[in-house]
UniProtKB/Swiss-Prot annotation:
It comes from Mus musculus (Mouse). It is found in: Nucleus. GO terms for molecular function: DNA binding; DNA-binding transcription factor activity; DNA-binding transcription repressor activity; DNA-binding transcription repressor activity, RNA polymerase II-specific; RNA polymerase II cis-regulatory region sequence-specific DNA binding. The keyword Transcription regulation applies. Residues 35-50, 86-109 have a biased composition (Basic and acidic residues). Residues 143-158 have a biased composition (Pro residues). It comes from the Eukaryota. This is Transcription factor 7.
């Protein structure tokens, strides 16, 4: 079995990186896999070997960044076999002894797709953060840094953290991870959903192809509490025209943006300025002032009753006596009794009431000389008569007002000039 080269070069020196008697069987729980896929070097084991080689690269970066004299491990090529990858996995376990074996076993369990190939491998013990951008040319893959362990208060995530990876690629100066930002400043962190894993798979070959166009939204200079009624404004998502991946933006950030006209940007009714309420008051006052003159005109014009005739004067005088004699309270029945008694009167008795009626008419004519019964009973006829008079005078009546419109002046004639 080929071993990893140490600083001196011998494979059988007995170093701690890979011993021939310590081999781990990573497929002891994969009983559902076929023997054909297990024996083929081009099948899932090749993808597994590439993922394990990326772990060795991370261990090299950890040793170089911490200043610890590394063992000088070098990778011969990306197309190594499965036995060498098993030795490298054992090396990574020795370099990171604090990782639990259960999390490594869960991370190395890759689900089978319908085509039989591994679409992606999810590592529950890593967050796959890239703290620094690549320093070499565009054609080389960046050297990954050691993975950050999950903090004791955070549950292990089953989906790779995509937003922190984008942030470190896009910013020229490295900034702390968004996990720390969310704890210090209270910035809302996007939720990781399992459906992202089916569309964006992270492998050792696709780590260097992520675009540099996505950044974490920075909090405002003066953060506002949600109780004041205003929402924080986040920058609109912008992406390069040739970017293969869109920017990840949580729906709550888009809904909370302070865009005018958006339903989420409508303030609470309690903080609406009083100027809007004051603008409505003059309009209500105008409506009231327009309705008041009409009511005043109708109230000023008293209803003039017609003078009473002889029978009405008799009824006015005898009604109280009839009500006292009879037990009936209905007005119609009382009027019938009064009518019978009126016709039973003699001519001399009726002449007395006729004389009273004549005097009543004379008094009414003196009080109201121009009065006519049509003022009380002919309102519809009076309206039609007013319309007829206005039509004969030539005035044009407006449909919404009571005043006649002025005749439109003819437009002046403009002479045409030929150019």
């Amino acid at each position: 079995m080929p071993q990893l080269d140490s600083g001196g070069g011998g494979a059988g020196r007995g170093d701690d990186l890979g011993a021939p008697d310590e081999l781990l069987a990573f497929q002891d729980e994969g009983e559902e896999q076929d023997d054909k896929n297990r024996d083929s070097p081009v099948g899932p084991e090749r993808d597994l070997a590439e993922l394990k080689s990326s772990l060795v690269n991370e261990s090299e970066g950890a040793a170089a960044g911490a200043g610890v004299p590394g063992p000088g491990v070098r990778v011969h090529g990306e197309a190594e076999g499965a036995p060498e990858a098993l030795g490298r996995e054992h090396t990574s376990q020795r370099l990171f002894p604090d990782k639990l074996p259960e999390s490594l076993e869960d991370g190395l369990k890759a689900p089978e797709c319908t085509s039989g190939m591994y679409k992606e491998t999810v590592y529950s013990a890593f967050n796959l953060l890239m703290p620094y951008p690549p320093a070499s040319g565009a054609g080389q893959h960046p050297q990954p840094q050691p993975p950050l362990h999950n903090k004791p208060g955070q549950p292990p995530h089953g989906v790779p953290q995509l937003s922190p990876l984008y942030e470190h690629f896009s910013s020229p100066h490295p900034t702390p991870a968004p996990a720390d930002i969310s704890q210090k400043q209270g910035v809302h962190r996007p939720l990781q959903t399992p459906d992202l894993s089916g569309f964006y798979s992270l492998t050792s070959g696709s780590m260097g192809q992520l675009p540099h166009t996505v950044s974490w939204p920075s909090p405002p200079l003066y953060p506002l509490s949600p109780s004041c009624g205003y929402r924080q404004h986040f920058p609109a998502p912008t992406a390069a025209p040739g970017a293969p991946y869109p920017r990840f933006t949580h729906p709550s950030l888009m809904l909370g943006s302070g865009v005018p006209g958006h339903p989420a940007a409508i303030p609470h009714p309690a903080i609406v300025p009083s100027s809007g309420k004051q603008e409505l008051q003059p309009y209500d006052r105008n409506l009231k002032t327009q309705a008041e003159p009409k009511a005043e005109k109708e109230a000023k014009k008293p209803v003039i009753k017609k003078p009473l005739n002889a029978f009405m004067l008799y009824m006015k005088e005898m009604r109280a006596k009839v009500i006292a004699e009879c037990t009936l309270k209905e007005s119609a029945a009382i009027n019938q009794i009064l009518g019978r008694r009126w016709h039973a009167l003699s001519r001399e008795e009726q002449a007395k009431y006729y004389e009273l009626a004549r005097k009543e008419r004379q008094l009414h004519m003196q009080l109201y000389p121009g009065w006519s019964a049509r003022d009380n009973y002919g309102k519809k006829k009076r309206r039609s008569r007013e319309k007829h008079q206005e039509s004969t005078t030539g005035g044009k009546r407006n449909a919404f007002g009571t005043y006649p419109e002025k005749a439109a002046a003819p437009a002046p004639f403009l002479p045409m000039t030929v150019l």
